[in-house]
Design a protein with these regions (language model features):
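Loop/turn positions that initiate beta-strands
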Residues: 89-91
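Low-complexity, Pro/Thr/Ser/Gly/Ala-rich linker/spacer regions in secreted
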Residues: 1-4, 147-159, 198
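Extracytoplasmic Gram-positive cell-surface binding/anchoring modules and repeats
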Residues: 165-176, 184-186
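Catalytic Cys-His active-site segments of thiol-dependent hydrolases/isopeptidases
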Residues: 101-131
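Repeat-associated, polar segments at repeat-unit boundaries in modular proteins
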Residues: 182-198
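N-terminal capping segments
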Residues: 1-62, 96-98, 109-111
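Low-complexity, Gly/Ser/Thr/Pro-rich intrinsically disordered linker/tail segments
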Residues: 129-155
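Extracytoplasmic/secreted envelope proteins and their assembly/folding machinery
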Residues: 7-14, 43-47, 157-161, 173-176, ...
């Protein structure tokens, strides 16, 4: 049975696992350890979160199959584009044979043998948010919405819409930029703003 996870929960877990001691290991999904290090490959990061690893995981649970990075972007994502200015919080970012999670604020969490050899934060080249965290930069080819993630958390978006009405995000282009930088889809938020103002 397909069980969606809220985008904020998904991103929070990805950022939390980046803080734990990890090593990159092909074919693992946070289901094994090497000493204190949790082992994980790139698609295993996404699957591991969705399957409940490393703590109470169950292989292929929650309607999420065991697929690789290329299958994940081609068969398990919607709205796939090569335009990185369209990045939204919780989207998968992909290049041939590799995948990561865009967490908003110019941060991707990915598991890679490159740079830090494990789960790490990087910057997606072409992102509309500046690399203010001075992260290693990777050029991704595509991004898309994972079908296992609930990107429409109405209560969260309703609060954001209320904050927009109060002026927290500015007006005009500044509002669009600020919402995008915060990882929200401007059009979705604006629809809720319009409905609240009726």
């Amino acid at each position: 049975m397909l069980k969606l996870i809220k985008v904020n929960d998904f991103v929070t877990k990805a950022l939390a696992y980046e803080q734990r001691p990890t090593l990159y290991k092909l074919g693992t999904y946070m289901n094994r350890k090497n000493g204190k290090y949790i082992l994980c490959d790139c698609s295993g990061l996404i699957k591991g979160i969705l399957w409940g690893y490393p703590d109470k995981g169950r292989y292929c649970s929650n309607g999420v199959p065991d697929v690789n990075a290329n299958t994940m972007i081609s068969k398990c994502c919607t709205g796939v584009t090569s335009d990185m200015s369209k990045l939204r919080k919780g989207m998968a970012v992909w290049l041939n044979g590799h995948i990561g999670i865009y967490c908003g604020d110019g941060v991707v969490v990915e598991s890679s043998p490159r740079w830090e050899n494990g789960i790490q934060r990087t910057y997606p080249k072409g992102c509309p948010v500046a690399n203010k965290h001075k992260l290693n930069t990777r050029k991704w080819s595509k991004c898309g919405y994972l079908k296992w993630i609930d990107y429409t958390s109405t209560s969260d978006l309703t609060q954001v819409a209320k904050d927009v009405i109060k002026g927290k995000y500015g007006n005009g282009k500044k509002r669009i930029d600020n919402l995008t930088k915060a990882g929200y889809n401007y059009e979705e938020v604006q629809k809720i703003v319009n409905s609240l103002l009726k």
